[in-house]
Amino acid sequence: MRVLGIDPGYAIVGWGVVEYAGNRFAPVDFGAVCTDAGVPFERRLDEVYTGIKEVIERTQPEVLAIEKLFYQHNQTTVIGVAEARGVILLAAAQAGLPIYEYTDRKSTRLNSSHAT
């Protein structure tokens, strides 16, 4: 099974693709979609959406794993991340990917225990 893992954001969206077979994870690809703070926010959302669509098309994952949104003290930041997360989920849904949501703590533990 090929899994695309996403750490959502609107400035930087981290992503990694792993192949899972026979109780083993193998890294396939990784990167980030970065947006420029100097452009309008709606343009940044478009860049996130387009970037994630390109990653999905290029890496052909079977499922998407994404961090759940958690409350931050800065409401402006949490709203922006929620909006970016929305366009990421849209790209995944349009590609027909099942979506699995995890807490940041669990996904960090999973990623670090299988990192190479």
Question: PLM features: residue spans?
Answer:
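Single conserved hydrophobic/aromatic residue that forms the stacking wall/gate
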Residues: 110-116
